Amino acid sequence: MWMLVPIAFALKLLNVFLQPLGSVWSSLGPLFLQLRAASWLAGGERSRPLQDRREAGEPGRAEGEDGGDLPTTPTSVNYHFTRQCNYKCGFCFHTAKTSFVLPLEEAKKGLLMLKEAGMEKINFSGGEPFLQDRGEYLGRLVKFCKQELQLPSVSIVSNGSLIRERWFQKYGEYLDILAISCDSFDEQVNVLIGRGQGKKNHVENLQKLRTWCKEYRVAFKINSVINRFNVDEDMKEQITALNPVRWKVFQCLIIEGENSGEDALREAERFVISDEEFEAFLDRHKDVSCLVPESNQKMRDSYLILDEYMRFLNCRNGRKDPSKSILDVGVEEAIKFSGFDEKMFLKRGGKYVWSKADLKLDW
C-alpha cells in the first residue's frame, strides 16, 4: 500500500508545476504536509524514539522487531571519576591503580551522552571524590548535572573527611543526596579498617556532616561495609539518632585485581564474612526502618559502574573487565559490555525516591 504514496505524490507535484507560478507556492505546502503524514504512518512504531517507547511502558530490554534486545537504559550510573583516596580501607574494591582524571569538559560531554541515553540519576564516587581540586571538580560536575542536564537525582559517596562547609554553601543546592561511608561507631575499629584520620574522629565528623546536610537541605545517607571487624557491632542506637534517609549495608565483597590477587593493592580476604554472619547482622538491625541490605549476590551485577576513563566495568566474573569508553564508541555500544543485570537492579531496590524535591524531608 505504502509503495503507492511516492507515485501519487510525484503526479501531484508534476501537476503543481504545470500551474501558473503564483499558484505553485500555495499548492506546495499542503503536499509536503501530506507526505510527512504518510511517512509517519508508514514508519509507525519504528519512527518513535527509543526513550518514547520506554515511557509508553516498554521495558529497558524489550525485544525489538528483529528479535534482538533493545539497548539497556542507563537509568542510574555510578561514576568513579577518580581512584585516588586519602584513606586505606583494607577491603576497598576500587583502588588507586591510576591517578587519571578526565578533563572537566570531557567529563561533561560524557555525562550529556548518558543523559541523552536515558540517565536519571548520577552518583559520583571514587576513590575520594572531594580530593580532586579540593572538591571544585566535583562541585562543578554536580552543578552541571542538576542545573544544565536537569537530572532528577545527583548524589555523592564520600568518606567525609575533606568536606568543608563552604562546599555546601557553593554547591549544596544542586546536590540531592550525600552518602557518607561509616563502618563503625568505635574509633578503634575504624583505625583497624583503615578509616583512621589521625587526630580527627570519624564519628564526630559524621555528626557534623549530618548537621550541614540538614542546614543546606541535602538528604543524608550512610553506607556501611560489614566485615570481620564490625560484624558483631550493634549500631541501632547511633543510626537511629543520625536518622539518615537510607542506611546502605553492604557485605564485604572480593574483586579480583582490586582487593584480591597478585595485582591487587589490597588484601581483603581477612575482612570477608560468611553469608550467615551477614544475615545475623541484618537480623540484629531489622528494626532500623532505613536499613537497605545488599549481599554479595545483589551487589555484583546490579550496578552500572563507570570508571575514570568513562568505561563500563563488568563485574560478573569476580573482577572488573572494562568496556571501551563511551567517549569513543557511544553509550549504546559500551553498555553492551557492562554485565548489568537490570532485573537485579530493580530487585535490590535500585530505583527509589532519589530526588530531594520528592523526599519531603522534615528539614
Swiss-Prot record:
The residues that hold [4Fe-4S] cluster are C85, C89, C92
Predominant location: endoplasmic reticulum
N6-acetyllysine: which positions carry it? K199
- What does the activity regulation annotation say? IRAK1 and TRAF6 synergistically activate RSAD2 increasing its activity with CTP as substrate about 10-fold.
Cofactor(s) named in the record: [4Fe-4S] cluster
Listed GO molecular functions? 4 iron, 4 sulfur cluster binding; lyase activity; metal ion binding
The record's free-text note on cofactor binding: Binds 1 [4Fe-4S] cluster. The cluster is coordinated with 3 cysteines and an exchangeable S-adenosyl-L-methionine.
Chain's role: Interferon-inducible antiviral protein which plays a major role in the cell antiviral state induced by type I and type II interferon. Catalyszes the conversion of cytidine triphosphate (CTP) to 3'-deoxy-3',4'-didehydro-CTP (ddhCTP) via a SAM-dependent radical mechanism. In turn, ddhCTP acts as a chain terminator for the RNA-dependent RNA polymerases from multiple viruses and directly inhibits viral replication. Therefore, inhibits a wide range of DNA and RNA viruses.
Q: Basic and acidic residues compositional bias: what residue ranges?
A: 46-64
The record's NCBIfam families line, in alphabetical order, gives: viperin, viperin_w_prok
The protein's topology relative to the membrane is: Peripheral membrane protein
Cellular compartments per GO CC:
endoplasmic reticulum; endoplasmic reticulum membrane; fibrillar center; Golgi apparatus; lipid droplet; mitochondrial inner membrane; mitochondrial outer membrane; mitochondrion
Q: Where in the cell is it found?
A: Endoplasmic reticulum membrane; Golgi apparatus; Endoplasmic reticulum; Lipid droplet
- Give the EC number: 4.2.-.-
Keywords, A to Z, come to: 4Fe-4S, Acetylation, Antiviral defense, Endoplasmic reticulum, Golgi apparatus, Immunity, Innate immunity, Iron, Iron-sulfur, Isopeptide bond, Lipid droplet, Lyase, Membrane, Metal-binding, Mitochondrion, Mitochondrion inner membrane, Mitochondrion outer membrane, S-adenosyl-L-methionine, Ubl conjugation
Q: What does the subunit comment say?
A: Homodimer. Interacts with IRAK1 and TRAF6. Interacts with FPPS. Interacts with HADHB. Interacts (via C-terminus) with VAPA/VAP33 (via C-terminus).
Which reactions is this enzyme annotated as catalysing? CTP + AH2 + S-adenosyl-L-methionine = 3'-deoxy-3',4'-didehydro-CTP + 5'-deoxyadenosine + L-methionine + A + H2O + H(+)
| Protein name stated in the entry | S-adenosylmethionine-dependent nucleotide dehydratase RSAD2
Notes concerning its domains: The N-terminal region (1-42) is necessary for its localization to the endoplasmic reticulum membrane and lipid droplet.
For the region Disordered, what residue ranges are annotated? Answer: 46-73
Where would I find the Glycyl lysine isopeptide (Lys-Gly) (interchain with G-Cter in ubiquitin) crosslink on this chain?
A: K208
Q: Which residues form the Radical SAM core domain?
A: 71-291
GO biological process annotations for this chain's record?
A: CD4-positive, alpha-beta T cell activation; CD4-positive, alpha-beta T cell differentiation; defense response to virus; innate immune response; negative regulation of protein secretion; negative regulation of viral genome replication; positive regulation of immune response; positive regulation of T-helper 2 cell cytokine production
